Amino acid sequence: MTTEQTDIMDKIQSFRPHLKPSTIKQYYHQLKKLQMRLKENDFEFLMNADDTIQKINKLTSDKNPSELLHFTSKRNIYNPVILYLLALDKDKNVIKKYEVERDKLNNQYQDEQLTGKISSKQGKNFVHIDDIIKMITTMKNELKPKLKTNMNARDIALLKAYTLFEILVRFPTRNDLAGLQLITPSKFKKITEEEKKNNNYIVRAKPNSYFVWNEFKTDKKYQSISENIPKDLEKIINTYIKINNYKSGDIIFDFSRNGLSQILLNASGKYLGGIQLSTTMIRKSYLSSKYSD
């Protein structure tokens, strides 16, 4: 690990102490990738927000260089950029420019989700919700005999993917599960509004645990939404928490939004014969099923 990487990761850790090193490392690598793609020597280029935003808008896809970068990929660039600048206490006016761009892309994403419309590009990865549920059942049956044994890393990875899919077919959010923090009701009452605004939570309470979603809106439209977790899903999540020995305050899905996407894409690709499901496609399958009648 270079001195630069250590210094940046330490500053982000101090700014967001609840983030685990693996998540911060992912953010750093996203920043480094942007720096390399724009052929810059350091991160000072980020201080020229107008020029950087213009260059990001011209970036092309890694998989298909003839296509511009998808808007969700651009959004995922802005999140670590904003976090980095906040952690280093940089000019708030510069940060605001990046936040405006990110929020535009968030709004674009939300508008697409409300329509449930499937683009030609997404069509090849569209599956009916029943097929997703069958996939989840296959995962469940594969996991069942392993839950009472010493699970290896591959088993734990499958449990993580299974738990994510079980949540997403009931709560078809965006990638807001990334960085989800486990917390008790008493501790949740003590956290500041600023902390609530920048994180999403699973609150373990009686008689019902519940999710608190805070990152799905722009600052101007900010509000908090709580959703009770059904008992059958709560049991699945509790199993995941117990096996991983998570405690209050821990991040139970310790990966970036891009990391979450990769988990879903890889797992679904294996169980659906190469069809790869993102949170977007799960949501579209959910909406298609819900409003098909």
Where is each model-derived feature located?
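N-terminal DNA-binding module of tyrosine recombinases/phage integrases
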Residues: 1-14
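Basic, Lys/Arg- and aromatic-enriched nucleic-acid-binding interface segment
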Residues: 134-175
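Non-catalytic DNA-binding core/recognition domains of DNA-processing enzymes
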Residues: 13-105, 264, 280-284
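Alpha-helix N-cap/helix-start motif at helix boundaries, enriched for small hydrophobics
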Residues: 24, 164, 176-181
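Flexible interdomain linker/hinge and immediately adjacent N-terminus
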Residues: 94-146
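Active-site/catalytic core of tyrosine-dependent DNA strand-transfer enzymes
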Residues: 222-282, 286, 291
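Conserved tyrosine-mediated DNA breakage-rejoining catalytic core shared by Y-recombinases
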Residues: 180-231
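A short, basic/aromatic helix-end/turn motif that makes direct DNA contacts
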Residues: 180-186, 280-281, 291-293
